[in-house]
Structure formats: structure tokens, C-alpha cells
């Protein structure tokens, strides 16, 4: 079990007059001796980071330099440097709380991503993180995984191989020494919260008294529908309503200082140390949410700003975001009235501190990072299977590829595997999917197939963990859902469309080995596939029938350009694509040639007809799961909302 013994959760009703609170209140996380300022106010330091995404060694190149208001540029990133900066900022500030508004793990640096995010938790424990808000990526596996493995340290399938690994000191993974919260993530419509909605920390005041400081937590609206965190058993509620409800409860219990930590964001200019022209959902919320909230700390958009905004009563309060990937530590200083515990707003300050490299990296944290880098290197090189054929993404004129067929067969296999032990989401009866569909060259987004799997000069090659892990997926789950025969037919028709130049384009879908279909290469877009020419398990497609189809959550939710699938019903989530494809290779033992011929032009008239201009394949992505990194970079360069 983890080290949550320092935190006591109370359930007795009543007001907060001394160190007690109802509901999900917490005991103080630090022993505080500070901190009455010279003016008689009680100083409180709030330190926060956001959207670390497991980038322990350094920020990715695109995020490694940030620019301040005067045009000065800073090289930033890396938790070893952050640990040093945190130690400096905390010095002499005993009433100090270190927290994060989400997306600390489930990122894209290989050691964290591939090793069940356990390296990230060890680093955060060492830095003394006090608590965190659940972001969308904290739900990339399941709510049960977040609570039972990441918080409580309980092992799951593959213990000792894929999880519950020895840390840098040789200790078995024990989970986080901090707790996660969310006020608006609930178990389905009308369900109970999956995490506590808020909590109370305690601030030392004169005369041995302690003042309550409440923290409300919000998860990004729509998390359950995002590609990576697609969760059929989760619902996110309106953010303003949830925050206002919690603020009212805290005030009713005598908490007069309240902070909102929310995993939704905004953009407010390009300088990390100021703010201008704000926009975005967090900004809209900041103007409307309860005036009882004294500070708003945001995340999710991978932006950086610090500014003051008026609450609904016109009083200013800080509105901040601390970038991403370890770029920045935000510091808010609150001064509390020593009698009432209320925040003296006029004295509040906020600063975004760059996580620069002009300090000595913390040696203990450097050891942690180096340990996990070495562990990941050894892990990556482990042989999980062998291959006796090459698998290429290159498309035939009919829109097939050997890599596409391999991946479609994996998806069908994955649909028949049991859910992991922490997954409590609804699972409709019916077993495996009837067929698999995989987008090979979608018009929007990009395929989950990242690279080829090529055979070397030998007749049989080993397949390492890293080769399989990098070949397929970007951390989204496969999902099986019910669609009608009409929807399935329409999705096949949507492979063809006319582009802005009037050219017919073809964005093919790979199908699993139990499917055969032909199309009319001379027909118009929208009328190329006859139901009688689509065979699933040897039987013709019935437009009035119901089929269970497995595909990526990215495709199922319409982000690949096949909107006919969007009316799906009864979804069942499977494991993350990267993890599942590795398991498939290991289960097969040997990858053998996968024949083509699942898709053909009707009557063999491909050359004589107009099959359509194949949508170009995306560039191979050998080092970062796609499409997240590419989409983030594109959004950032255009000033748009990041994909995060």
C-alpha cells in the first residue's frame, strides 16, 4: 500500500472551526511552522506544475525553449532540475503546498509510457507532490487503474513484468504518496463520483491554530469521449455547476479560502510570465464560477500564462497555467486573515518560474531518471516473438496492405481477450467482435499503424518489445461496439470522397481475415459497395442486421473521417493499442505472412475503372506514438487548441 497514512479522511458532519471537516476532507500534508507575515497575515505558498506527461529526463524538443514577456528565451525541462528549483522555492516557506491540475502520467516518453507510468510516480513521490487533480490522461487506462494501481499500488496482470516493477532503490512499486481528486468525473449518468471531489489542507496560524484551505478539482469536460481516455463507464459533469456546488459546501463548513485546480485550459498570449487576450473554456469558467473561489489553476491546453481576472463580484483572483512537460513551476502566494482564514485578495501574487538548466540538477532525482532510462533500454530490447515475413504499410491499388491486414487481425483477436482486472466499465454480452476495421490512410488524423515491420536478411528475425510497441498504436484503446448493417455499409462507402479539386480520393479501411468484399471501381462515390458483395464470416451483409465491430476509439468517434460509425451503441473498451499489439505478438510467438485479397475490384476491373486516388500514407513515426505529438505541434504552431 502507499503512504497515504499522513492523510486522514473524515466523515463527521459539522462546520470547520478547528482541524476537522466533513466529506472528503484531508489532514494536513505538511508540518507547518511558518508563517505570519510582518503585516500579521498568514502566508501560504501554492506551487503547481501541470501536464508533465511522464517527461522525466527532458521536455521534447518542440517544448524545450519558452519565451518570456521581454523576449528572453529559456531552455527548460527535466525533473532533476525541477527538484532543485522546488527546493529553492520552498526554502523557509513551511505553509507550502505542491500540487498539479492533471495529466502527470500517460505521456509519450518511452520509459514512463511503456513501464505502466511507475517511473513518473516515483519521481513525483520524491518531489513531495501533495495532491493532484485527475486530468483526461489519468483515465487513459481505466478509473480502476488510477485508484487501485497508481494510488494504492495494487498489482495487476503481468505483475513483475509489465507492472509492479522495482524502483530505483529496489523497492516494489507501492503507488503514489498523494491522492487524486475530481468533482465532476462520475460513474456514468447519475452515478457516484469516481474520486473525492475536493479536500481541505491546513495552514498554521498564530497561537497554534490551524486555518482550513479548500481545494476543488475538475476534470476536462468530455474526457470519456476523448480518443485516449475513451471510457464507456465514465461521465464528466458541467464544470461550473460542479465547482459552484463544492464551493458552497466548503463555505457552509467554515472554509473561507478556496482554490480551484482544474484540468481544462486557455490561451493567454505567447509569453509564459504574463497573460493577455485570454480565451478558452477555462477563461469562460473563470469569469462565471463562484466568487468564493480565490484562485484558479488550470492545465490541459499546454499553454503558459499568469494573470489576474475579476470574479463575478469584480474582485481580482489569479488565473494561471504552467505550460507542460516540466517547463514551469507556478507559484501563487496567498495571505490569509489570521482570524477568519479568508484570503486578502489585494495581497495575492502569482509567478511562473521557468524550470531552467542554470542550476545543479538534484542528484537523487538524477539517479531516479537514469535508473528508469536504463531499465527501459533493457526492457525495450527484450525479444517477445519472431517474424518470418515482412509487413508493409504500402497500399495496393485495391487499398490493401500486409501491415494493415496484420493489424486488423490483431484487432479482432483483441476483441476476444478478457478485460483487465481494474476495468469496471459496462461490457455488453456477445463476446468477440464480428469483424475489425482499421483506418490505413484516413483523410483526417492518421492511422494507428506507425511503421513497417520488415524482415532482415535472415529467414527469421526476433521481434523486440520496442519494435512491436512503436509499430502500432498511440495509446488509445480498441473499442468493440454495435452498428447496423446500414452503418457498416455506409462506412465502407465513405472510403471514397471527392476532394476540393474535384478528384476522387480513396481512404481505405483494412478488414479482418473473416471479411471479403469487392467494390465497383467505375461507380460514383457513395455507390460503390453492394451489400451482397460484402461477406462477413461467409454471409452477405444485411443492412437491417446488427454487427459488433472493433476498431480504434479514434476511428469509432469519427475523428478519422468515417462518420457513419458515429451512431454506435453498447461500446466495450479493450486494452490500449500499444500494450495490446505487444501482447498479440507475444501470443502468436511467430508472425507469418498474411495474404492479401480481402478487398478487390468487382469483376477484376480495377485498371479500367476509377479506383480513386489513394490518400497518402502519413510519414512513419518511429519514435513517438501518433497522432498526438504531431497534432500538438501543429496546433501550437498555429495558435490553436492543443490535442492533449
Put a short name on every predicted segment.
Residues 39-87, 91, 125-126, 224-240, ...:
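Catalytic centers of hydrolytic enzymes
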Residues 19-24:
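C-terminal segment of classical bacterial N-terminal signal peptides
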Residues 4, 8-17, 28-354, 403-410, ...:
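Acidic, metal/ion-coordinating pockets
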Amino acid at each position: 500500500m502507499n503512504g497515504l497514512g499522513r492523510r486522514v479522511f473524515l466523515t463527521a458532519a459539522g462546520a470547520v472551526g478547528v482541524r476537522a471537516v466533513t466529506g472528503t476532507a484531508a489532514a494536513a500534508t505538511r508540518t507547518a511552522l511558518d508563517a505570519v507575515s510582518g503585516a500579521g497575515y498568514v502566508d501560504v505558498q501554492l506551487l503547481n506544475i501541470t501536464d508533465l506527461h511522464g517527461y522525466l529526463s527532458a521536455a521534447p524538443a518542440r517544448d524545450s525553449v519558452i519565451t518570456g514577456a521581454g523576449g528572453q528565451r529559456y531552455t527548460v525541462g527535466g525533473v532533476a532540475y525541477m527538484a532543485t528549483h522546488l527546493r529553492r522555492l520552498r526554502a523557509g516557506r513551511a505553509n507550502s503546498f505542491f500540487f498539479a491540475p492533471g495529466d502527470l502520467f500517460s505521456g509519450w516518453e518511452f520509459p514512463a509510457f511503456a513501464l505502466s507510468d511507475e517511473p513518473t510516480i516515483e519521481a513525483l513521490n520524491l518531489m513531495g507532490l501533495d495532491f493532484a487533480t485527475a486530468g483526461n490522461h489519468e483515465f487513459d487506462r481505466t478509473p480502476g487503474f488510477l485508484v487501485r494501481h497508481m494510488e494504492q499500488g495494487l498489482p495487476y496482470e503481468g505483475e513483475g513484468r509489465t507492472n509492479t516493477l522495482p524502483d530505483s532503490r529496489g523497492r516494489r512499486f507501492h503507488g503514489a504518496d498523494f491522492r487524486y481528486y475530481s468533482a465532476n468525473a462520475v460513474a456514468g449518468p447519475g452515478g457516484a463520483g469516481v474520486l473525492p471531489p475536493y479536500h481541505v489542507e491546513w495552514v498554521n496560524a498564530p497561537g497554534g491554530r490551524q486555518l482550513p484551505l479548500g481545494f476543488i478539482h475538475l476534470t476536462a469536460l468530455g474526457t470519456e469521449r476523448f480518443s485516449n481516455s475513451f471510457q464507456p463507464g465514465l461521465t464528466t459533469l458541467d464544470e461550473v455547476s460542479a465547482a459552484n456546488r463544492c464551493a458552497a459546501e466548503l463555505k457552509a463548513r467554515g472554509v473561507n479560502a478556496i482554490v480551484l485546480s482544474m484540468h481544462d485550459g486557455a490561451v493567454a498570449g505567447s509569453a509564459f510570465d504574463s497573460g493577455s487576450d485570454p480565451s478558452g473554456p477555462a477563461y469562460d469558467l473563470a469569469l462565471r464560477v463562484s466568487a468564493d473561489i480565490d484562485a484558479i489553476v488550470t492545465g490541459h491546453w499546454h499553454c503558459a500564462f499568469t494573470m489576474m481576472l475579476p470574479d463575478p463580484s469584480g474582485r481580482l483572483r489569479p488565473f494561471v497555467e504552467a505550460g507542460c512537460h516540466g517547463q514551469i513551476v507556478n507559484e501563487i502566494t496567498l495571505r490569509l486573515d489570521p482570524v477568519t482564514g479568508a484570503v486578502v485578495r489585494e495581497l495575492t501574487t502569482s509567478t511562473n518560474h521557468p524550470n531552467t538548466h542554470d542550476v545543479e540538477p538534484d542528484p537523487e532525482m538524477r539517479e531516479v531518471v537514469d535508473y528508469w532510462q536504463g531499465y527501459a533500454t533493457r526492457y525495450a530490447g527484450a525479444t517477445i516473438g519472431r517474424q518470418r515475413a515482412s509487413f508493409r504499410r504500402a497500399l495496393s491499388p485495391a487499398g490493401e496492405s500486409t501491415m494493415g491486414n496484420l493489424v486488423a487481425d490483431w484487432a479482432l483477436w483483441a476483441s476476444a481477450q478478457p478485460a483487465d482486472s481494474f476495468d469496471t466499465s459496462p461490457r455488453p454480452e456477445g463476446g468477440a467482435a464480428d469483424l475489425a476495421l482499421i483506418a490505413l490512410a484516413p483523410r483526417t488524423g492518421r492511422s494507428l499503424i506507425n511503421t513497417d515491420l520488415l524482415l532482415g536478411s535472415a529467414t527469421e528475425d526476433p521481434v523486440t518489445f520496442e519494435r512491436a510497441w512503436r509499430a502500432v498504436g498511440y495509446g488509445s484503446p480498441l473499442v468493440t461496439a454495435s452498428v447496423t448493417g446500414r452503418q457498416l455499409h455506409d462506412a465502407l462507402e465513405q472510403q471514397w470522397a471527392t476532394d476540393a479539386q474535384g478528384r476522387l480520393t480513396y481512404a481505405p479501411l483494412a478488414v479482418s481475415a473473416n471479411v471479403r468484399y469487392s467494390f465497383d471501381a467505375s461507380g460514383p462515390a457513395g455507390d460503390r459497395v453492394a451489400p451482397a458483395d460484402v461477406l462477413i464470416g461467409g454471409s452477405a451483409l444485411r443492412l437491417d442486421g446488427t454487427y459488433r465491430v472493433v476498431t480504434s476509439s479514434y476511428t469509432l468517434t469519427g475523428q478519422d473521417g468515417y462518420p457513419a460509425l458515429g451512431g454506435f451503441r453498447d461500446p466495450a473498451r479493450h486494452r490500449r493499442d500499444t500494450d495490446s499489439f505487444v501482447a498479440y505478438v507475444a501470443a502468436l510467438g511467430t508472425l507469418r505472412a498474411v495474404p492479401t485479397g480481402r478487398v478487390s475490384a468487382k469483376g477484376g476491373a480495377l485498371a479500367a475503372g476509377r479506383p480513386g486516388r489513394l490518400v497518402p500514407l502519413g510519414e512513419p513515426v518511429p519514435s513517438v506514438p501518433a497522432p498526438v505529438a504531431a497534432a500538438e505541434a501543429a496546433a501550437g504552431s498555429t495558435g490553436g487548441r492543443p490535442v492533449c
